[in-house]
């Protein structure tokens, strides 16, 4: 039941937004007034004149066209700020430096501070809550590219 309600509300929203967009485009592109000022004062003779008179009166209810351009420009600038300004702000201000310890751990972590490798093995390596420890590059290289790996190939 909840899924159907979401489908219907999404459909109604998309149709409503499309109608508003079409109305805005027509409002900005239609000439105003549709009828000459002399013909507006007279009684409409044809159906097209009466429709044009109705549309002229309908357009008078809307704000001036200047405001639709201003609103569209403000929306565009807001989009530029969101798409460009916020990621730059996040990258330059909110992101910690790469050499900061907060990039690899948080306040709940158990950071290893050992004097020797043997002390690390006895204190942290085989316990349930191992500490955060940077592996030496020599051990990583030996494990990945050592002689034992080449013999198995």
From Swiss-Prot:
Keywords: Cell wall biogenesis/degradation, Endoplasmic reticulum, GPI-anchor biosynthesis, Membrane, Transferase, Transmembrane, Transmembrane helix. It is a multi-pass membrane protein. GO terms for biological process: cell wall organization; GPI anchor biosynthetic process. Residues 36-67 are lumenal. Residues 1-14, 89-153 are cytoplasmic. Part of the complex catalyzing the transfer of N-acetylglucosamine from UDP-N-acetylglucosamine to phosphatidylinositol, the first step of GPI biosynthesis. Involved in cell wall biosynthesis. This is Phosphatidylinositol N-acetylglucosaminyltransferase subunit GPI19. It comes from Eremothecium gossypii (strain ATCC 10895 / CBS 109.51 / FGSC 9923 / NRRL Y-1056).
